[in-house]
Amino acid sequence: VNDAGQNCIVLFPGANRANTKEHVDEVLSHFGKGDVVVLQNEINLIDYIVDRAYEKEMVIAMNPSPFDQAVMDCDLTKITYFFVNEIEGEMLTGEKDPQKIMAGVLAKYPMSRLILTLGSDGAWYADKDGRCYQEICKVKAVDTTAAGDTFSGYFLASVLGGKTPAQALKTATVASGIAVSRKGAVPSIPTAEEVAQKCGEME
């Protein structure tokens, strides 16, 4: 993490790229309609996973990082939630401006929901019905490991638990803000009680 709180990630795929179709089928056999599959492009066979999950009427959330041809080989019309930063948003749309990224994604994939994270500039949620913005939770960034996972996990848990997208965006932002203020990956992820307390303090 540099002095501005930004991170630099080096990826070594290892076992992440050793999935087989048989293994995917076995795992997905335990899930059905309305269950959630969360994907990041650190594993292989994401196109196959998307297709099988869609057939089962699952909710499909995707973070297309690291962005490469494997993402474009997927039928992205099947994605329920896109979690992207400005770089991935530009790769999907060819646009740099956040407003144009949101418009571009929804033009291509009108049934999807987009969560666009902009680092210190906050985050946006957009779908065919509208958009909402959430500023960052200002903290001293100590370690950004697991911040994105914390954000997406809390957002999905919140919105699927009945919160509005705006409420879910706030909850996710608070949770990831707490996470970056601590060292480590899993140990940095706050409990639901911690997040609820912090959200209450902000009201």
Residues covered by each model-derived region:
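Conserved N-terminal subdomain of the carbohydrate kinase-like
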Residues: 1-36, 51, 56, 196-203
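A short acidic, helix-capping loop that chelates divalent metal ions and anchors anionic groups
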Residues: 7-10, 88-92, 188
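Active-site donor-binding loop signature of nucleotide-sugar glycosyltransferases
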Residues: 12-14, 84, 136, 191
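Structural alpha-helical scaffold elements that stabilize or flank donor/cofactor-binding regions
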Residues: 29-30, 74-75, 107
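Conserved beta-alpha-beta core of the PfkB/ribokinase-like small-molecule kinase fold
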Residues: 36-104, 122-123
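Conserved phosphate-binding/catalytic region of the ribokinase-like
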Residues: 69-70, 99-203
